Swiss-Prot record:
Name of the protein: Exocyst complex component 6
Gene expressing this chain: sec-15
A UniProt-annotated Pfam family: Sec15_C
Single Gene Ontology BP annotation: intracellular protein transport
Annotated keywords: Coiled coil, Exocytosis, Protein transport, Transport
Organism listed in the record: Caenorhabditis elegans
GO cellular component term of the entry, any: exocyst
Length: 817
């Protein structure tokens, strides 16, 4: 330390010397002093301003030297202070090191003493605790030995209760719990452990109730899983009982198979004395028979109803019988709502079957529970549940199945729904609304059938050749007779080829009608309808079909059909009308049997009148077609009204017209007599009117005597045709009267018998009764016009004839007044 002090003194002296020398050589202005003062005293934020001011003075080097001088001065002062205090610092550090060593020794001694005290205290506490524990053990053991005999029954029963709870014997656990509470706990209730037991047993009832509810929910879930199988077996049993969907042939085959199966179990042997001995054999059954036996199960075999009985017992003991009954009904109602609500789209036949099987299974289980636990559900509750389900079932089936356009699908579903009805009915459920649903489906089914057969009817109309059927052999003849009920005396003796009056369309339509009726009967099978109701319904369906067919025909005949087509349609209509009687007999044979044919009392009669409107339309079309064809031929007429003399033979168009009439009227052989007469008469009237229009047409300005003779000759040809008309039953005299008006007019004008006409005009016995004065005037004026045009006809010598004709015209005009 002294050395250090002595060493620092020379250094200080040297520093001061250096500083003094620096001060002596550096001069510092007042401005530099100010700047240094500012740098020493100002904060860092204002330092930039001071530095900028220094640079602004322009004497940076002088300031740098002044700054260096100031730094050197401060360094010297720091060295002085350090040199002055250095020895004292060294002495203080040496004393501090000594004090540290002493403190460490004291600390170690203190820790050792504390550890020893802790060990001694711990051993003392352990000894004390052991003494206290042993004394308590001795006392408690003595007390326990005295009271254990009293507590053992409680503990044994409690253990029994726990075991029963773990084994899910809840009803027995309830009985044990009651014994504990009312018998054993009362004897040891002063002990605290009994309170613990009582507290632990308090939630046992609630736990048992929850477990019972859980077990019942599992039972409901199991019902939901196997409801479809139960319903399937129940439906199968019902189908077997009612021989549902089994024909007589299938039933006989099944009986034979059962007999053969039973016979295979018997072996016949001859004993020693010669007698026959039967031995029952028990062969191993194959897998198929085992599967059949497995299917012969009931609801009791598929479902264990024990949980229901157990829950009833448990809730009776708990005093919550009404609560469980209400819970049961609510759960079954919710489950019923789930069952009757389809879980998928009903777009498959299998889906419909599964849906109805689940419903059957649900209500079969409900019926079984009602029989075994009558307190859970009553007949009223069951009926209410069924009524609600029935309404929704009907809605779902009607919504999802009612609009089905598939006839085969509807027939299949009808059988499924009918089997569902019979199954539910066998369990005592009301099924009348389902029969109503089937009847609604029947109407929809019939409507679909009608549309299909109407479409087929229209196709048959389009493809028909409208030619009478011709057969070339006995086999073909019998085929047509089997298809359509046609009878004609002595037709079987006619040589081949034989011709029927109707076209193939009639046999096709009659066959389609029978197929339609058979289709209607298929849906009505087993619908709880008596024979009379079925017969009436089928007849109404037949009338509907005939009415629709009449509508199709009515639309068809408005197309542009030929005369041959119209005539054949009329003939076909006649035979279709006649076939209604045979259709009625066919319906009776299908609904009441062959022996009931001929009994028509209280039956809906097949309406033959449905084709009347169509017949009228066809007749009108025939009239129009005839008039149109006649007009086409007459339009070919090209009269030369100034012809000087007649040609001596009928005009060409008249010959064509008569040939056409001859051919057409000949084809009317199979037409109804009245229609043929009507068409013939109306056609002749139309020809007469058309010829009159020719003669009286305003376009014809003049008529020569030769033209009038030719016109009269043409009319005469028409009159001759009426006398030999090929239409059977037509009175030639009556038919000739269609040209009477025209003939009297021609006779009057050509004979110039005006005196007779004027004298007898308006009288009943007049010779020219059918001639009107106005008509005669028109023809006469045209003849006068022709004479006027003729060269020199009205010359001086002919003045008297002109006056005569003018006088006749004036007299005729007076007759009109």
């Amino acid at each position: 330390m002294p050395n250090s002090s002595s060493t620092s003194q020379p250094a200080t002296t040297g520093s001061e010397t250096a500083s003094t020398s620096y001060v002596n050589y550096v001069e510092m202005s007042a401005e530099q002093e100010y700047f240094l003062y500012e740098l020493e005293t100002t904060d860092s934020g204002s330092m930039g301003l001071v530095l900028r001011a220094i640079y602004d003075t322009g004497d940076v080097q002088s300031f740098a030297r002044a700054l260096q001088q100031r730094i050197s001065h401060y360094d010297k002062n720091i060295q002085k202070v350090c040199s002055f205090h250095y020895q004292s610092f060294v002495d203080a550090m040496q004393e501090l090191m000594k004090l540290k060593e002493q403190c460490q020794d004291i600390k170690e001694e203190t820790v050792a003493i504390d550890a020893e005290i802790q060990q001694i205290s711990q051993r003392l506490c352990q000894k004390k605790q052991e003494i206290v524990r042993y004394r308590k053990l001795m006392k408690n053991a003595k007390t326990a030995m005295d009271q254990i005999a009293v507590c053992l029954p409680v503990l044994e029963n409690y253990a029994k209760l726990q075991e029963q709870m773990s084994n899910r014997k809840y009803y027995q656990a309830l009985k044990t719990l009651e014994e504990l509470e009312h018998t054993h706990l009362a004897l040891v209730e002063k002990y605290r452990f009994t309170q613990v037991l009582a507290k632990s047993m308090a939630p046992v009832r609630l736990e048992i109730k929850e477990k019972a509810y859980s077990e019942f929910k599992d039972f409901l879930e199991n019902i939901k899983k196997v409801a479809g199988r139960i319903g399937k077996h129940a439906s199968k049993d019902t189908a077997e009982q009612h021989s549902f969907g089994v024909t007589d042939a299938e039933r006989a085959k099944k009986i034979q198979e059962e007999a053969r199966k039973n016979a295979s179990n018997v072996e016949i042997e001859v004993s020693a004395d010669g007698s026959i001995v039967k031995k029952n054999m028990s062969p191993k059954r194959n897998m198929k028979m085992q599967v059949e036996d497995d299917e012969q199960v009931s609801a009791q075999d598929l479902i264990d109803f024990t949980p229901v009985h157990r829950c009833c017992q448990i809730f009776n003991v708990l005093g919550a019988k009404e609560e469980f009954e209400q819970y049961y009904r609510q759960q079954r109602k919710e489950q019923c709502d789930l069952v009757i609500e389809p879980t998928h789209k009903m777009n498959n036949f299998k889906h419909y079957v599964e849906y109805l099987d689940e419903i059957v299974g649900f209500f079969v289980v409900e019926d079984q529970i009602l029989m075994t636990q009558s307190n859970l559900s009553t007949t009223v509750d069951k009926d209410k549940l069924w009524d609600n389900a029935l309404m929704k079932i009907r809605q779902h089936l009607d919504a999802r199945f009612g609009g089905s356009p598939d006839v085969l699908m509807m027939l299949k579903m009808k059988k499924v729904i009918l089997l569902f009805i019979l199954t539910m009915k066998s369990y005592g459920y009301a099924v009348a609304p389902l029969y109503e649903l089937l009847q609604n489906f029947r109407d929809q089914y019939n409507e679909i059938l009608v549309k299909e057969y109407c479409a087929q009817f229209e196709r048959d109309l389009e493809k028909d050749n409208y030619t009478p059927i011709t057969v070339n052999s006995e086999e073909e003849f019998r085929t047509i007779i089997r298809k359509f009920p046609f009878y004609k005396r002595s037709m079987e003796q006619e040589p081949f080829p034989r011709r029927f009056p109707f076209s193939p369309f009639v046999t096709d339509a009659y066959t389609q009608a029978k197929n339609y009726l058979i289709g209607c009967l298929k849906f009505m099978d087993n619908l709880q309808l008596n024979t009379s109701a079925v017969d009436d319904t089928v007849r109404r369906c037949a009338n509907v079909l005939l009415g629709r067919w009449a509508g199709v025909l009515k639309s068809f005949v408005h197309k542009r059909l030929s005369m041959i087509q119209l005539v054949q349609i009329t003939i076909n209509l006649g035979y279709l009308e006649k076939s209604c009687e045979s259709l009625g007999a066919f319906i009776t044979s299908k609904t009441s049997g062959e022996e009931a044919i001929g009994t028509t009392s209280h039956q809906v009669v097949l309406s033959e009148k449905v084709f009347r409107d169509v017949r009228s339309e066809v007749e009108q079309q025939i009239d129009e077609c005839m008039r149109s064809k006649v007009d086409e031929i007459i339009d070919l007429a090209n009269y030369d009204w100034e012809l000087p003399a007649a040609a001596g033979q009928a005009s060409e168009f008249i010959s064509d017209l008569i040939n056409f009439l001859q051919t057409t009227f000949t084809s009317f052989t199979n037409l109804p007599s009245g229609l043929a007469k009507h068409v013939c008469t109306q056609t002749c009237k139309h020809i007469s009117q058309s010829m009159s229009d020719f003669l009286l047409s305003p376009e014809t300005k003049c008529i020569s005597t030769g033209a009038l003779d030719q016109f009269s000759l043409d009319v005469m040809q028409c009159e001759m045709f009426t006398t030999r008309c090929p239409v059977a039953g037509v009175d030639p005299q009556t038919l000739s009267m269609t040209f009477a008006d025209l003939r009297q007019l021609l006779d009057l004008v050509m004979s110039s018998d005006w005196t007779t006409f004027n004298a007898e005009y308006g009288k009943d016995h007049a010779k020219y009764l059918r001639v009107k004065a106005s008509t005669a005037i028109v023809v006469l004026e045209k003849m006068i016009e022709f004479e006027r045009k003729s060269t020199g006809f009205f010359g001086i010598a002919k003045g008297d004839r002109k006056k005569l004709l003018d006088t006749i015209v004036r007299q005729l005009k007076l007759l009109e007044i």
